[in-house]
Amino acid sequence: MPKMKTHSGAKKRFRVTGSGKIMRQQANRRHYLEHKSSRLTRRLKGDQLVSKGSIKQIKRMLGI
């Protein structure tokens, strides 16, 4: 049986912490920022944990 390939899109979008949690970037911070408030863009800066419902699928794509 051949090895599973890592999903290229997933490896660019998600990172695994030392404790095994999966982090992701927040959406809506790429362009059209002039009409978004500073408060909103500041809040979107940080990474966030992946929701519990998506963890199993993302781990499979990353080959974890």
UniProtKB/Swiss-Prot annotation:
Keywords: Ribonucleoprotein, Ribosomal protein
GO cellular component, as recorded: cytosolic large ribosomal subunit
GO biological process: translation
Keyword Ribosomal protein: yes
GO terms, molecular function: structural constituent of ribosome
Keyword Ribosomal protein part of the UniProt annotation: yes
Stored Pfam families: Ribosomal_L35p (PF01632)
Protein family according to the UniProt entry: Belongs to the bacterial ribosomal protein bL35 family.
Protein name: Large ribosomal subunit protein bL35
Organism name: Micrococcus luteus (strain ATCC 4698 / DSM 20030 / JCM 1464 / CCM 169 / CCUG 5858 / IAM 1056 / NBRC 3333 / NCIMB 9278 / NCTC 2665 / VKM Ac-2230) (Micrococcus lysodeikticus)
